[in-house]
Amino acid sequence: MTTITLKLNEPIDVALRRFRRDIEKTGLIRELRARTGYEKPTTERKRKKASAVARQRLQAKRLLPPRKMY
């Protein structure tokens, strides 16, 4: 379980931002979204393949030399 302790004179929105970041790191949000309802195996494969293609696209984009600015 993720807990956040408020620091002295820390605004609530900053603490909430820290909490959300910690939740994202643990992968809790991703797991909750996956468990909200049944996903058909074909839909799951399609979603995973689309995310893999997007990852490959980003990776290839990073390998390209930067564009000229002039």
From Swiss-Prot:
It comes from Burkholderia orbicola (strain AU 1054). The keyword Coiled coil does not apply. The keyword Ribosomal protein applies. Signal peptide: none annotated. Belongs to the bacterial ribosomal protein bS21 family. Keywords: Ribonucleoprotein, Ribosomal protein. GO terms for biological process: translation. GO terms for molecular function: structural constituent of ribosome. This is Small ribosomal subunit protein bS21B. It holds the Pfam family Ribosomal_S21. GO terms for cellular component: ribonucleoprotein complex; ribosome.
